[in-house]
C-alpha cells in the first residue's frame, strides 16, 4: 500500500470510529469523541468538520458549563440515510411473505409491516425493494435475510423459496438503484442480533439454535463479535447433521424435524454437537418448536457428554423477530458507504 493509500485508509477508519461512537450515544463533545476514538483534538475537529459539511453529523447546543468554557455537542444525523431491513419468512403453520422494517441511522423504526406472499419470485423481490426506495429516497442501504444459504457474492440458495435459487439481489439492486445491498443467511443475521442485544463488558461467544415449526432448523454462532459463516457460508445448516437413530433414516429424521415431530432428541444432539465443536459461553434455544420443550431436558442430556465446567449458559426464547431485525440493521449499517 502506498503512503497516500495508507493515509486514506487510516482516515476512513477514523471516520468509521467517530460514526460508531455517535451511533451509540445521544450526543458527545469533541473532547469526549477524541478520547473515545483515540484521536488528537485537531484530527477530531477536522474530521467532524467534514462530516458536518456532508450532513452526517449535527452540531447541537452547547453543553452546560461547569465554570469553564461551554463545549459544543455533536450527534449523528439520524436522517442522513435510512436503512431497509427485510427478510423472507416461510412457515407452514404461521405465515409466508416478506417482513420489513425501515430504520434511521440510530436504529429507530420508521415503518414496519408484513407482506403476505405464497411464493417469492426474483422479480417480486426486486420490484418490492425498488418501490420502497422510490417511496423513501433516503433509503441508501438494504439488508436482505434469506431462509437458505447465500454465497460470498450474494447469490441465493433457498429451499423455502425455490424460485430464488441462483438469484443475486445484491448485484441486481446495486446496479439498478445505486445503493448498498447485503444478503445473508437468516441465522447469521439473527445470531449477530442476539450478540448486539446482549452486550457484555468483555469478549464472549454465543450460539443460537433455531427450531421453527414446520421448517428445517438452523444455527448461528458469533465469537467476539465475528459471525462464523464458514468457507462457503454453509455453517449452521443443521439439516446436514447426521441426526439419525437406529429406527429412523436420514430422510425420516429430516421429515420429523420439518414437521416438528419428536423434536427433543434432535435438539439434544444439535446442542451437544454445538457445545463440543464451538464451546460457546451462551447457547440460545429458539423457535416456536421450543414452546413445548423443557430446557432441563436439553441440559440434562448435554451433561451426559459435556463436563460441567464446559457447559454454556442456556437461554430459551421462542420468538427471534427482534433479534433478526437487529442483526440485519446492524450489519447493513456497517456496510453503508459514505462520501467521507
Task: Mark where each language-model region is.
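ATP-binding/phosphotransfer module of carbohydrate and carboxylate kinases, centering on a glycine-rich
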Residues: 1-112, 120-131, 138, 245-340
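Short glycine-aspartate micro-motif
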Residues: 83-87, 141-143, 205-210, 218
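Hydrophobic beta-strand positions
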Residues: 102, 149, 220-221
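Glycine-rich phosphate-binding loop and adjoining helix at the ATP-binding site
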Residues: 109-197, 202, 297-305
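Glycine/GP-enriched mid-protein hinge/lid loop-to-helix segment characteristic of carbohydrate kinases
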Residues: 112, 176-275
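Short glycine-rich anion-binding loops that position phosphate/pyrophosphate groups of nucleotides
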Residues: 147-149, 214, 289-290
Amino acid at each position: 500500500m502506498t503512503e497516500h493509500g495508507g493515509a486514506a485508509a487510516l482516515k476512513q477508519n477514523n471516520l468509521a470510529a467517530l460514526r460508531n461512537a455517535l451511533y451509540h450515544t445521544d450526543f458527545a463533545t469533541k473532547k469526549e469523541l477524541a478520547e473515545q476514538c483515540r484521536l488528537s483534538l485537531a484530527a477530531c475537529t477536522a474530521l467532524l468538520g467534514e462530516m458536518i459539511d456532508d450532513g452526517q453529523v449535527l452540531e447541537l447546543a452547547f453543553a452546560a458549563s461547569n465554570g469553564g468554557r461551554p463545549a459544543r455537542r455533536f450527534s449523528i444525523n439520524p436522517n442522513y440515510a435510512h436503512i431497509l431491513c427485510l427478510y423472507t419468512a416461510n412457515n407452514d403453520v404461521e405465515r409466508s411473505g416478506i417482513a420489513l422494517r425501515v430504520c434511521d441511522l440510530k436504529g429507530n423504526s420508521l415503518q414496519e409491516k408484513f407482506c403476505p406472499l405464497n411464493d417469492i419470485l426474483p422479480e417480486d423481490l426486486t420490484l418490492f425493494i425498488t418501490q420502497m426506495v422510490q417511496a423513501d429516497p433516503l433509503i441508501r442501504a438494504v439488508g436482505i435475510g434469506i431462509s437458505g444459504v447465500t454465497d460470498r457474492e450474494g447469490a441465493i440458495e433457498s429451499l423455502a423459496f425455490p424460485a430464488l435459487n441462483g438469484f443475486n439481489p445484491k448485484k441486481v439492486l446495486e446496479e439498478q438503484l445505486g445503493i448498498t445491498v447485503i444478503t445473508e443467511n437468516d441465522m447469521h443475521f439473527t445470531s449477530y442480533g442476539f450478540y448486539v442485544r446482549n452486550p457484555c463488558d468483555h469478549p464472549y461467544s454465543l450460539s443460537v439454535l433455531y427450531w421453527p415449526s414446520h421448517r428445517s432448523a438452523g444455527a448461528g454462532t458469533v465469537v467476539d463479535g465475528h459471525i462464523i459463516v464458514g468457507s462457503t457460508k454453509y455453517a449452521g445448516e443443521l439439516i446436514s447433521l447426521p441426526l439419525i437413530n437406529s429406527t429412523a433414516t436420514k430422510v425420516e429424521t429430516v421429515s420429523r424435524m420439518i414437521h416438528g415431530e419428536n423434536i427433543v432428541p434432535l435438539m439434544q444432539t444439535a446442542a451437544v454437537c454445538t457445545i463440543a465443536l464451538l464451546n460457546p459461553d451462551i447457547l440460545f434455544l429458539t423457535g416456536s418448536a421450543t414452546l413445548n420443550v423443557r430446557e432441563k431436558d436439553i441440559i440434562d442430556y448435554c451433561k451426559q457428554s459435556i463436563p460441567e465446567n464446559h457447559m454454556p449458559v442456556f437461554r430459551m426464547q421462542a420468538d427471534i423477530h427482534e433479534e433478526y431485525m437487529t442483526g440485519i440493521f446492524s450489519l447493513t449499517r456497517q456496510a453503508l458507504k459514505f462520501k467521507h
